[in-house]
Amino acid sequence: MNDFGEEDERQILEGTFVDKSSKQTTNDNENNNNNNNREEENENQDKNVTTKNDEDNNNDANDGDDDDDDLFGDKDLEENDNVNSDNEKNKSKKDKEDQDQEEQQEDQEDEEYSNKKKKKKSKKNKNRHSTEEDETMEDANENLDFATGAGEEEEEEEPELIRDPITLTHIETSNVLPAQKIMKLKLLNILGIQPKPFDPITFEDEEAMNGDEKSKFNVESVIRWRWGLDLNGRPAKESNTRLVTWSDGSSHLYIGNEVLEIKEQPLQNEQFYVYSSQDGFIECEGKIDSRLSIRPTNIKSKVHQRLSENVAKRTVKVSKIKSIHTTLDPEKEKEKREKELLDALREKKKQKDDSYRPNRGRGGKSGSLTASYLENDDDDYDSYRNEKGDDFVVDDDEDEEDDDYKESDDDGSDSSDDDGSESGESESDSDGDNKSKKKENKNSNDNKNNKSRKQDFDDDEDEDEDLIVSTKKVKRRVIDDDDDDED
């Protein structure tokens, strides 16, 4: 591992760091290789020199005359000097060649590093979503890889896709004049355009089919065109619309007798183009330069009046809320009806209760005190007594008379007591006979009503029984006293 200082880290982040240790190691290796090659060459040269010397000696031996001339070996020394000089020259050449190779290698490495850096930068420019931090980190990683020798492999280039050639044909458009200026127009509900040529035969059918579109604008405010004949008898296009530009720069659109004001606004920051589409591709016709806005000339114009009428008609048809005019408060009317219903229910219930209630003097409500009312009351009570199976009649008036009669017997003489007792017995017997006859005559008529009235008397049954028992005791006591007097 290489130890990097603060300056090395700063150079790595800036992308200017160069690893010297790796270059030194590579240079040392190359120098060692060169030295080894040089030693081998020197050995070969020495061998060649020795072989030459041997050959020369052999030649000298053969030629004795020559040996005599060269007794001190000057020739050999000269030849050795020449060989050494040649070797030195060769070494200097090889050193120069080695230096040149080293310089070339360094240049190649620098070029490769710069090329890699350029590729990385081009990729970073293409990737718009990368941030500055990512770029700095990538540069640092690249420098580290290059310094340590880890990123020496060349990046694989993406293979180019070879696609089938596309044959483009010009899109045939309508034979119109070339547009000098293309403008954008937004259609409002006061204006319509009919792209099909006008035909008086099919006009009514088309308008009937396009009822929804017809409701948006009037027939008179629709831009139309048709085929006609010019002065030379050739077919030409005719339209009911004219665009007039005045000297002051203002423009008006005439549709028949209708006049509309036009204002042009340039498109500054917007980019709109007109395209002609075809299967597989589209063809650009031109750029939209400006926008047109159309409006009525004034409020009193026919177009504006017709538009307001159509809007009013649509609002009347579409409105679903219905209003009702009334002078009475619905809440009070509702309370009044509820009160009347409650009163009717109370009256009905009251009548029903009165129909089931008996006509008695004791207890419930009664009518006026007439003879018939009193007789009916007695009859009701007598019928109730007959149902109980008791023939004894209880009468409060008779009890009071008996009590008075008893007191008179105590105060008077014995003869008067006998007369009073006989007269009291005779009166009681006569009254009992008369009442029994009346009972027999009325029992037949009252039995039918007794069943319905019996239920109403169930609550008063206990009180009636107590009253009957008390009256029996009083009556019997009086009769027993009379019997004792007779004895």
Swiss-Prot record:
Belongs to the LEO1 family. Signal peptide: none annotated. Residues 1-142, 344-487 are annotated as: Disordered. This is RNA polymerase-associated protein LEO1. One of its GO terms (molecular function) is RNA polymerase II C-terminal domain phosphoserine binding. Residues 86-97, 344-357, 382-391, 441-456 have a biased composition (Basic and acidic residues). Residues 27-36 have a biased composition (Low complexity). GO terms for biological process: positive regulation of transcription elongation by RNA polymerase II; transcription elongation by RNA polymerase II. Residues 56-81, 98-112, 132-142, 392-431, 457-467 have a biased composition (Acidic residues). PANTHER family: LEO1 PROTEIN, RNA POLYMERASE-ASSOCIATED PROTEIN LEO1. Keywords: Activator, Coiled coil, Nucleus, Transcription, Transcription regulation. The PAF1 complex is a multifunctional complex. May be involved in both initiation and elongation, histone methylation and RNA processing. It is found in: Nucleus. Residues 331-357 form a coiled coil. It comes from the Eukaryota. Component of the PAF1 complex. GO terms for cellular component: Cdc73/Paf1 complex; nucleus. InterPro entries: Leo1 (IPR007149). Residues 116-128 have a biased composition (Basic residues). It comes from Dictyostelium discoideum (Social amoeba).
